[in-house]
């Protein structure tokens, strides 16, 4: 009798994606982040659903409804902090996943990579809108500052901002629509994830060497299912350590003060996972220039396949490119640190240098390194 998992129309899809999928035999733990992102998304949807049952998206009650969740709802505090810190874990996994793609040349799978960049932008938009919902000081002022950036668009900017706000400032209408978008976007993300996987399974996974692995494949189950479970356990350990011991470590104390349009916090800054982009935004004195640099800092990922000059796909055997990659990683950490600092000397100059370095490494140094390494191959 034919195996049901191979014949049933629904089970066949699951089987071909998670059970009998031919996978390279040598993929390292850097390939765990895809499944971890799936788990993070599931966790965020579940915790978010339970939070939405008790949250009210009205300016007069939003802050107190979050307080009510933490104080009065059964295990509401753990649901709330798992959702807030789950977002941080989500972004850690996202950045690791993108970094893996850059290092091992996975961006040569064009469709998979482009959908991935769209996913990154969608997740960033979702996280930004989620940060506005508790309606604390940083929620309100973060929403005001970031949405206001759109006013830098020539001619239509001001009208566009007022259209997004639903009035002349961030108010009731803004909060309500942000809640609606924050609720629906994770489901759109889930659909995009399926498209991402669909394109990935057209080509099969990359591997650390960057060499085609068709001659050496193993079934996904049990080898990589057990490996993914280990990754999930490590993720949950890290998440629960954060949630149970220092749930507010990555948050901003200002967000425990209810939103007040008449009182501006001394340092307006987004969540830690946006600080690198925020630092790039602030490093340019011109408003429109800053906004363009901010957008470019993410969309530059779309250029990666065009900037690949090396004859080798992976950086595994390319020491010069490896040095530049880790320099880029250090540069992003520097930008993250600068984004959280006040706009004063010496932080301004450090931020500008780090921003120039970011674009220089990606647009100039890495392609040049690839060409140099091609020359070295002939020696």
UniProtKB/Swiss-Prot annotation:
UniProt cofactor(s): heme b
Primary location class: mitochondrion
Binding site for heme b b566: 97, 196
CDD domains to which the protein is assigned, alphabetical: cytochrome_b_C, Cytochrome_b_N
Keywords in alphabetical order: Electron transport, Heme, Iron, Membrane, Metal-binding, Mitochondrion, Mitochondrion inner membrane, Respiratory chain, Transmembrane, Transmembrane helix, Transport, Ubiquinone
GO biological process: mitochondrial electron transport, ubiquinol to cytochrome c
Binding locations of a ubiquinone: 201
Coiled coil (residue ranges): none
Annotated membrane topology: Multi-pass membrane protein
Localization, UniProt: Mitochondrion inner membrane
GO molecular function: metal ion binding; ubiquinol-cytochrome-c reductase activity
Any single GO CC term annotated in Swiss-Prot or TrEMBL for this entry: respiratory chain complex III
Any Pfam family: Cytochrom_B_C
Miscellaneous information on this protein: Heme 1 (or BL or b562) is low-potential and absorbs at about 562 nm, and heme 2 (or BH or b566) is high-potential and absorbs at about 566 nm.
Cross-referenced PANTHER family: CYTOCHROME B
Functional note: Component of the ubiquinol-cytochrome c reductase complex (complex III or cytochrome b-c1 complex) that is part of the mitochondrial respiratory chain. The b-c1 complex mediates electron transfer from ubiquinol to cytochrome c. Contributes to the generation of a proton gradient across the mitochondrial membrane that is then used for ATP synthesis.
Subunit structure: The cytochrome bc1 complex contains 11 subunits: 3 respiratory subunits (MT-CYB, CYC1 and UQCRFS1), 2 core proteins (UQCRC1 and UQCRC2) and 6 low-molecular weight proteins (UQCRH/QCR6, UQCRB/QCR7, UQCRQ/QCR8, UQCR10/QCR9, UQCR11/QCR10 and a cleavage product of UQCRFS1). This cytochrome bc1 complex then forms a dimer.
Family label: Belongs to the cytochrome b family.
Protein name as annotated: Cytochrome b
Protein species of origin: Tragulus javanicus
Taxon lineage: Eukaryota, Metazoa, Chordata, Craniata, Vertebrata
